[in-house]
Curated annotation (Swiss-Prot):
Pheophytin a binds at Q129, N142. It comes from Picosynechococcus sp. (strain ATCC 27264 / PCC 7002 / PR-6). Keywords: Chlorophyll, Chromophore, Electron transport, Iron, Magnesium, Membrane, Metal-binding, Oxidoreductase, Photosynthesis, Photosystem II, Thylakoid, Transmembrane, Transmembrane helix, Transport. The gene is psbD1. The lineage of its organism: Bacteria, Bacillati, Cyanobacteriota, Cyanophyceae, Oscillatoriophycideae. A plastoquinone binds at H214, F261. The chain crosses the membrane at residues 40-60, 124-140, 152-165, 207-227, 278-294. This is Photosystem II D2 protein. GO terms for biological process: photosynthetic electron transport in photosystem II.
Length: 352
Protein backbone atom coordinates (compact mmCIF):
# COMPACT_ATOMS: atom_id res chain seq x y z
CA UNK A 1 0.00 0.00 0.00
CA UNK A 2 1.27 3.47 -0.91
CA UNK A 3 0.57 6.47 1.29
CA UNK A 4 0.88 9.93 -0.32
CA UNK A 5 1.63 12.75 2.11
CA UNK A 6 0.84 16.32 1.10
CA UNK A 7 -1.94 18.69 0.25
CA UNK A 8 -4.40 17.84 -2.44
CA UNK A 9 -4.12 20.26 -5.38
CA UNK A 10 -6.67 23.01 -4.98
CA UNK A 11 -8.93 24.09 -7.78
CA UNK A 12 -7.65 27.33 -9.34
CA UNK A 13 -10.38 29.93 -9.62
CA UNK A 14 -10.80 32.63 -12.23
CA UNK A 15 -9.12 35.16 -9.91
CA UNK A 16 -5.90 33.11 -9.79
CA UNK A 17 -5.90 32.66 -13.56
CA UNK A 18 -6.44 36.39 -14.11
CA UNK A 19 -3.77 37.25 -11.53
CA UNK A 20 -1.24 35.05 -13.34
CA UNK A 21 -2.10 36.58 -16.71
CA UNK A 22 -1.91 40.18 -15.46
CA UNK A 23 1.45 39.63 -13.75
CA UNK A 24 3.01 37.65 -16.60
CA UNK A 25 6.51 38.76 -17.60
CA UNK A 26 6.08 40.72 -20.82
CA UNK A 27 7.61 43.74 -22.56
CA UNK A 28 5.00 46.11 -21.09
CA UNK A 29 3.89 44.96 -17.64
CA UNK A 30 0.11 45.13 -17.17
CA UNK A 31 -0.72 44.16 -13.59
CA UNK A 32 -3.88 44.98 -11.69
CA UNK A 33 -3.01 48.67 -11.87
CA UNK A 34 -3.03 48.43 -15.66
CA UNK A 35 -6.77 47.76 -15.60
CA UNK A 36 -7.14 51.35 -14.39
CA UNK A 37 -4.10 52.94 -16.03
CA UNK A 38 -4.25 51.88 -19.67
CA UNK A 39 -7.94 52.54 -20.46
CA UNK A 40 -7.94 55.87 -18.60
CA UNK A 41 -4.68 57.06 -20.18
CA UNK A 42 -5.95 56.05 -23.64
CA UNK A 43 -9.26 57.84 -23.12
CA UNK A 44 -7.65 61.01 -21.71
CA UNK A 45 -5.08 61.27 -24.50
CA UNK A 46 -7.64 60.40 -27.17
CA UNK A 47 -10.10 62.97 -25.83
CA UNK A 48 -7.41 65.65 -25.78
CA UNK A 49 -6.27 64.91 -29.33
CA UNK A 50 -9.88 64.88 -30.55
CA UNK A 51 -10.71 68.16 -28.82
CA UNK A 52 -7.61 70.03 -29.93
CA UNK A 53 -8.07 68.84 -33.51
CA UNK A 54 -11.78 69.40 -34.13
CA UNK A 55 -13.69 71.01 -31.25
CA UNK A 56 -14.32 74.74 -30.91
CA UNK A 57 -14.57 76.71 -27.67
CA UNK A 58 -16.90 79.26 -29.21
CA UNK A 59 -19.93 78.12 -27.22
CA UNK A 60 -18.14 78.07 -23.85
CA UNK A 61 -15.45 80.77 -23.99
CA UNK A 62 -16.08 82.59 -27.25
CA UNK A 63 -12.73 81.37 -28.56
CA UNK A 64 -11.23 79.35 -31.38
CA UNK A 65 -9.24 76.49 -29.87
CA UNK A 66 -8.65 73.76 -32.47
CA UNK A 67 -6.35 73.02 -35.39
CA UNK A 68 -9.45 73.00 -37.59
CA UNK A 69 -10.01 76.68 -36.75
CA UNK A 70 -6.41 77.72 -37.42
CA UNK A 71 -4.76 77.37 -34.00
CA UNK A 72 -1.28 75.91 -33.55
CA UNK A 73 0.20 73.56 -30.95
CA UNK A 74 0.67 76.37 -28.41
CA UNK A 75 -2.85 77.84 -28.78
CA UNK A 76 -5.08 74.76 -29.13
CA UNK A 77 -6.94 73.60 -26.02
CA UNK A 78 -9.73 71.46 -24.68
CA UNK A 79 -11.63 74.22 -22.92
CA UNK A 80 -13.56 73.98 -19.68
CA UNK A 81 -17.38 73.87 -19.83
CA UNK A 82 -19.63 76.91 -19.83
CA UNK A 83 -20.14 78.76 -16.54
CA UNK A 84 -23.89 78.13 -16.68
CA UNK A 85 -23.36 74.36 -16.37
CA UNK A 86 -22.02 74.64 -12.83
CA UNK A 87 -20.34 71.47 -11.59
CA UNK A 88 -22.21 69.03 -13.80
CA UNK A 89 -20.10 66.00 -14.74
CA UNK A 90 -21.47 66.40 -18.28
CA UNK A 91 -21.97 62.75 -19.09
CA UNK A 92 -22.72 62.09 -22.73
CA UNK A 93 -25.97 60.43 -21.65
CA UNK A 94 -26.83 63.22 -19.19
CA UNK A 95 -29.65 65.75 -19.54
CA UNK A 96 -27.34 68.40 -21.02
CA UNK A 97 -26.27 66.45 -24.11
CA UNK A 98 -28.76 63.54 -24.15
CA UNK A 99 -26.51 61.30 -26.30
CA UNK A 100 -25.90 64.10 -28.82
CA UNK A 101 -22.11 63.91 -29.34
CA UNK A 102 -21.80 67.22 -31.22
CA UNK A 103 -23.76 69.08 -28.54
CA UNK A 104 -21.71 67.34 -25.83
CA UNK A 105 -18.49 68.63 -27.40
CA UNK A 106 -19.91 72.14 -27.80
CA UNK A 107 -20.88 72.29 -24.11
CA UNK A 108 -17.38 71.31 -22.97
CA UNK A 109 -18.01 67.64 -22.26
CA UNK A 110 -14.56 66.70 -23.53
CA UNK A 111 -12.97 68.75 -20.73
CA UNK A 112 -14.66 66.79 -17.95
CA UNK A 113 -13.93 63.58 -19.90
CA UNK A 114 -10.20 64.38 -20.13
CA UNK A 115 -9.99 65.70 -16.55
CA UNK A 116 -11.58 62.68 -14.88
CA UNK A 117 -9.88 60.05 -17.03
CA UNK A 118 -6.58 61.91 -16.66
CA UNK A 119 -6.88 61.97 -12.86
CA UNK A 120 -7.65 58.25 -12.67
CA UNK A 121 -4.89 57.54 -15.20
CA UNK A 122 -2.34 59.32 -13.00
CA UNK A 123 -3.59 57.43 -9.95
CA UNK A 124 -3.28 54.20 -11.94
CA UNK A 125 0.32 55.06 -12.80
CA UNK A 126 1.11 55.59 -9.11
CA UNK A 127 -0.54 52.26 -8.25
CA UNK A 128 1.55 50.66 -11.01
CA UNK A 129 4.70 51.82 -9.23
CA UNK A 130 3.38 50.42 -5.93
CA UNK A 131 2.56 47.11 -7.58
CA UNK A 132 5.88 46.63 -9.37
CA UNK A 133 7.83 47.73 -6.28
CA UNK A 134 6.04 45.05 -4.26
CA UNK A 135 6.68 42.39 -6.90
CA UNK A 136 10.43 43.08 -7.20
CA UNK A 137 10.85 43.57 -3.45
CA UNK A 138 11.80 47.25 -3.15
CA UNK A 139 10.35 50.12 -1.17
CA UNK A 140 7.58 52.27 -2.74
CA UNK A 141 9.24 55.70 -2.65
CA UNK A 142 8.81 56.18 -6.41
CA UNK A 143 5.06 56.00 -5.97
CA UNK A 144 5.23 58.36 -2.99
CA UNK A 145 7.25 60.83 -5.08
CA UNK A 146 4.69 60.64 -7.90
CA UNK A 147 1.97 61.64 -5.43
CA UNK A 148 3.30 65.21 -5.78
CA UNK A 149 2.30 65.67 -9.45
CA UNK A 150 -1.02 63.92 -8.75
CA UNK A 151 -1.73 66.35 -5.89
CA UNK A 152 -1.00 69.32 -8.17
CA UNK A 153 -3.21 67.98 -10.97
CA UNK A 154 -6.14 67.19 -8.68
CA UNK A 155 -5.92 70.50 -6.79
CA UNK A 156 -5.59 72.70 -9.90
CA UNK A 157 -7.96 70.95 -12.31
CA UNK A 158 -10.56 69.59 -9.86
CA UNK A 159 -10.38 71.12 -6.36
CA UNK A 160 -10.00 74.76 -7.45
CA UNK A 161 -13.04 74.86 -9.78
CA UNK A 162 -15.06 72.87 -7.22
CA UNK A 163 -14.50 75.73 -4.79
CA UNK A 164 -15.53 78.28 -7.41
CA UNK A 165 -18.91 78.61 -9.10
CA UNK A 166 -18.32 76.09 -11.91
CA UNK A 167 -15.83 74.03 -13.94
CA UNK A 168 -15.53 77.12 -16.15
CA UNK A 169 -12.83 78.50 -13.84
CA UNK A 170 -10.58 75.46 -14.20
CA UNK A 171 -7.63 75.69 -16.60
CA UNK A 172 -8.21 74.47 -20.13
CA UNK A 173 -6.02 71.63 -21.39
CA UNK A 174 -3.63 73.59 -23.57
CA UNK A 175 -0.41 75.60 -23.30
CA UNK A 176 -1.86 79.10 -23.81
CA UNK A 177 -4.96 78.13 -21.80
CA UNK A 178 -2.85 77.22 -18.78
CA UNK A 179 -0.86 80.47 -19.17
CA UNK A 180 -4.15 82.36 -19.05
CA UNK A 181 -5.10 80.46 -15.90
CA UNK A 182 -1.80 81.46 -14.26
CA UNK A 183 -2.49 85.13 -15.03
CA UNK A 184 -6.01 84.64 -13.66
CA UNK A 185 -4.63 83.25 -10.37
CA UNK A 186 -2.33 86.23 -10.04
CA UNK A 187 -4.94 88.85 -10.83
CA UNK A 188 -7.73 87.42 -8.69
CA UNK A 189 -5.76 85.75 -5.87
CA UNK A 190 -2.34 87.48 -5.79
CA UNK A 191 -0.92 83.94 -6.05
CA UNK A 192 2.76 84.88 -6.31
CA UNK A 193 2.68 86.42 -2.83
CA UNK A 194 1.07 83.31 -1.34
CA UNK A 195 3.47 81.49 1.03
CA UNK A 196 2.37 78.10 -0.35
CA UNK A 197 3.34 79.24 -3.83
CA UNK A 198 6.69 80.36 -2.44
CA UNK A 199 7.23 76.93 -0.89
CA UNK A 200 6.30 75.30 -4.19
CA UNK A 201 8.79 77.42 -6.13
CA UNK A 202 11.48 76.72 -3.53
CA UNK A 203 10.77 73.00 -3.77
CA UNK A 204 10.83 72.78 -7.57
CA UNK A 205 13.82 75.07 -8.14
CA UNK A 206 15.57 73.59 -5.10
CA UNK A 207 14.99 70.10 -6.47
CA UNK A 208 16.40 71.15 -9.85
CA UNK A 209 19.45 72.65 -8.12
CA UNK A 210 19.98 69.51 -6.02
CA UNK A 211 19.65 67.34 -9.12
CA UNK A 212 22.21 69.41 -11.03
CA UNK A 213 24.65 69.49 -8.09
CA UNK A 214 24.29 65.76 -7.45
CA UNK A 215 24.80 64.82 -11.10
CA UNK A 216 27.81 67.09 -11.46
CA UNK A 217 29.38 65.83 -8.22
CA UNK A 218 29.01 62.18 -9.24
CA UNK A 219 30.50 62.91 -12.67
CA UNK A 220 33.37 64.78 -11.00
CA UNK A 221 34.27 61.88 -8.71
CA UNK A 222 33.96 58.85 -11.03
CA UNK A 223 36.70 56.27 -10.56
CA UNK A 224 39.14 55.98 -13.45
CA UNK A 225 38.81 52.20 -13.55
CA UNK A 226 39.23 51.36 -17.22
CA UNK A 227 41.17 52.10 -20.38
CA UNK A 228 37.96 52.71 -22.32
CA UNK A 229 37.52 55.83 -24.44
CA UNK A 230 35.29 57.40 -21.80
CA UNK A 231 34.04 56.68 -18.29
CA UNK A 232 30.55 55.70 -19.44
CA UNK A 233 31.83 52.59 -21.27
CA UNK A 234 33.73 51.50 -18.16
CA UNK A 235 30.55 51.01 -16.15
CA UNK A 236 28.97 47.60 -15.68
CA UNK A 237 25.45 47.38 -14.22
CA UNK A 238 26.38 44.30 -12.17
CA UNK A 239 29.72 45.53 -10.83
CA UNK A 240 30.17 45.03 -7.10
CA UNK A 241 32.24 48.12 -6.38
CA UNK A 242 31.17 51.76 -6.28
CA UNK A 243 31.42 53.79 -9.47
CA UNK A 244 32.25 57.11 -7.77
CA UNK A 245 33.96 58.28 -4.59
CA UNK A 246 31.61 59.51 -1.87
CA UNK A 247 34.62 60.36 0.31
CA UNK A 248 36.06 62.67 -2.35
CA UNK A 249 32.66 64.28 -2.93
CA UNK A 250 32.25 64.88 0.80
CA UNK A 251 35.72 66.43 1.01
CA UNK A 252 34.98 68.72 -1.96
CA UNK A 253 31.71 70.10 -0.58
CA UNK A 254 33.14 70.38 2.92
CA UNK A 255 35.70 72.77 1.47
CA UNK A 256 33.05 74.68 -0.53
CA UNK A 257 30.40 75.16 2.18
CA UNK A 258 32.09 73.92 5.34
CA UNK A 259 29.38 71.25 5.58
CA UNK A 260 28.41 68.30 3.38
CA UNK A 261 26.37 65.12 3.34
CA UNK A 262 28.35 62.14 4.58
CA UNK A 263 25.45 59.70 4.31
CA UNK A 264 24.19 58.69 0.87
CA UNK A 265 20.83 57.68 2.27
CA UNK A 266 20.18 61.05 3.86
CA UNK A 267 21.38 62.77 0.69
CA UNK A 268 18.97 60.94 -1.57
CA UNK A 269 16.08 61.21 0.88
CA UNK A 270 16.66 64.98 0.93
CA UNK A 271 16.58 65.05 -2.88
CA UNK A 272 13.23 63.25 -2.69
CA UNK A 273 11.85 65.37 0.14
CA UNK A 274 12.50 68.86 -1.29
CA UNK A 275 10.59 68.74 -4.61
CA UNK A 276 7.78 66.46 -3.38
CA UNK A 277 7.14 68.68 -0.36
CA UNK A 278 7.14 71.72 -2.64
CA UNK A 279 4.52 70.12 -4.88
CA UNK A 280 2.35 69.18 -1.92
CA UNK A 281 2.58 72.66 -0.40
CA UNK A 282 1.59 74.33 -3.66
CA UNK A 283 -1.38 71.93 -3.85
CA UNK A 284 -2.46 72.96 -0.35
CA UNK A 285 -2.21 76.59 -1.47
CA UNK A 286 -4.43 75.97 -4.50
CA UNK A 287 -7.08 74.39 -2.27
CA UNK A 288 -6.89 77.57 -0.19
CA UNK A 289 -7.50 79.64 -3.33
CA UNK A 290 -10.49 77.44 -4.12
CA UNK A 291 -11.97 78.64 -0.81
CA UNK A 292 -10.97 82.24 -1.67
CA UNK A 293 -8.63 82.42 1.33
CA UNK A 294 -6.32 85.43 1.39
CA UNK A 295 -2.62 85.21 2.10
CA UNK A 296 -0.52 88.32 2.74
CA UNK A 297 -2.41 91.62 2.68
CA UNK A 298 -0.23 94.54 3.71
CA UNK A 299 -3.12 96.91 4.28
CA UNK A 300 -1.02 99.57 6.01
CA UNK A 301 1.06 100.01 2.86
CA UNK A 302 -2.07 100.22 0.71
CA UNK A 303 -3.61 102.88 2.96
CA UNK A 304 -0.42 104.94 3.01
CA UNK A 305 -0.03 104.64 -0.77
CA UNK A 306 -3.61 105.86 -1.21
CA UNK A 307 -2.96 108.87 1.05
CA UNK A 308 0.58 109.74 -0.06
CA UNK A 309 1.20 110.08 -3.83
CA UNK A 310 4.96 109.87 -3.25
CA UNK A 311 4.80 106.56 -1.36
CA UNK A 312 4.74 103.36 -3.36
CA UNK A 313 6.26 99.92 -2.83
CA UNK A 314 6.65 96.90 -5.07
CA UNK A 315 3.71 95.43 -3.15
CA UNK A 316 1.35 98.35 -3.83
CA UNK A 317 2.44 98.44 -7.47
CA UNK A 318 1.65 94.74 -7.80
CA UNK A 319 -1.77 95.28 -6.19
CA UNK A 320 -2.52 97.89 -8.85
CA UNK A 321 -1.38 95.51 -11.56
CA UNK A 322 -3.70 92.85 -10.12
CA UNK A 323 -6.59 95.32 -10.18
CA UNK A 324 -5.79 96.05 -13.80
CA UNK A 325 -5.75 92.36 -14.65
CA UNK A 326 -9.12 91.87 -13.00
CA UNK A 327 -10.66 94.87 -14.72
CA UNK A 328 -9.40 94.04 -18.21
CA UNK A 329 -9.48 90.26 -17.91
CA UNK A 330 -13.02 89.80 -16.61
CA UNK A 331 -14.78 91.21 -19.72
CA UNK A 332 -12.53 89.10 -21.97
CA UNK A 333 -12.67 85.93 -19.91
CA UNK A 334 -16.31 86.00 -18.87
CA UNK A 335 -18.07 87.34 -21.94
CA UNK A 336 -21.40 85.94 -20.80
CA UNK A 337 -21.40 88.28 -17.77
CA UNK A 338 -21.33 91.33 -20.08
CA UNK A 339 -19.10 93.33 -17.74
CA UNK A 340 -18.72 97.03 -18.56
CA UNK A 341 -16.29 99.04 -16.44
CA UNK A 342 -16.38 102.85 -16.73
CA UNK A 343 -13.05 104.55 -17.30
CA UNK A 344 -12.94 106.15 -13.85
CA UNK A 345 -12.86 102.82 -11.99
CA UNK A 346 -9.91 101.40 -13.91
CA UNK A 347 -6.77 101.46 -11.74
CA UNK A 348 -4.10 104.09 -12.16
CA UNK A 349 -0.80 103.87 -10.31
CA UNK A 350 0.74 106.84 -8.51
CA UNK A 351 3.40 107.06 -11.21
CA UNK A 352 0.88 107.34 -14.08
Amino acid sequence: MTIAVGRAPQERGWFDVLDDWLKRDRFVFVGWSGILLFPCAFMALGGWLTGTTFVTSWYTHGLASSYLEGCNFLTVAVSSPADSLGHSLLFLWGPEANWNFARWCQLGGLWSFVALHGAFGLIGFMLRQFEIARLVGIRPYNAIAFSGPIAVFVSVFLMYPLGQSSWFFAPSFGVAGIFRFILFLQGFHNWTLNPFHMMGVAGILGGALLCAIHGATVENTLFEDSDQANTFRAFEPTQAEETYSMVTANRFWSQIFGIAFSNKRWLHFFMLFVPVTGLWMSSVGIVGLALNLRAYDFVSQEIRAAEDPEFETFYTKNILLNEGMRAWMAPQDQIHEQFVFPEEVLPRGNAL
